[in-house]
Amino acid sequence: MALQRTHVLLLLLLLTLLGLGLVQPSYGQDRMYQRFLRQHVDPDATGGNDAYCNLMMQRRKMTSHYCKRFNTFIHEDIWNIRSICSTSNIQCKNGQMNCHEGVVKVTDCRETGSSRAPNCRYRAMASTRRVVIACEGNPEVPVHFDK
């Protein structure tokens, strides 16, 4: 009886560990996707001015401990952004081949160089331009803004 109980416990432990191994990668990818959304996606705005950058950088928690020097907000529907992941693979800045490019409306926010966290100040530049994003998963989702 004790031997049978031990086998059942070992089997449950094995299944639990196996399950954790399968869940972790998708959880990590989901975290990276959520971070990408928080840092780079603002579909309802047109952006384009310094006040927008100052507010959004603070609101999206990129000025808490230090002033993030540069960030880009994409002003497109998330499905339009995700569709970039279905374009041909190109090489990322880090050498990996999981990047894709597309043309989108953006606001680039550049730190002025004279501010200190949490009161960071930014200069805005709105444009429609080519962007490169890294995508991962199945289906692929954006996880990193490359350039």
Swiss-Prot record:
Keyword Phosphoprotein: no
Its job: Cleaves preferentially after uridine bases. Has antimicrobial activity against uropathogenic E.coli (UPEC). Probably contributes to urinary tract sterility.
Protein name: Ribonuclease 4
The enzyme's E.C. designation: 3.1.27.-
Gene that encodes the chain: RNASE4
Signal peptide: 1-28
Record's GO cellular component terms: extracellular space
Family: Belongs to the pancreatic ribonuclease family.
GO MF annotation list: endonuclease activity; nucleic acid binding; RNA nuclease activity
Pfam families linked to this entry: RnaseA
PANTHER family associated with the record: RIBONUCLEASE, RIBONUCLEASE 4
Intrachain disulfide bonds: C53-C109, C67-C120, C85-C135, C92-C99
Pyrrolidone carboxylic acid: modified positions: Q29
Localisation per UniProt entry: Secreted
GO biological process: one example: defense response to Gram-positive bacterium
Record keywords: Antibiotic, Antimicrobial, Disulfide bond, Endonuclease, Hydrolase, Nuclease, Pyrrolidone carboxylic acid, Secreted, Signal
Residue sites binding dUMP per the record: R35, H40, K68, N71, T72, F145
Cross-referenced SUPFAM superfamilies: RNase A-like
Active site: H40 (proton acceptor), H144 (proton donor)
Keyword DNA-binding belongs to the record: no
Gene3D superfamilies noted in UniProt: Ribonuclease A-like domain (3.10.130.10)
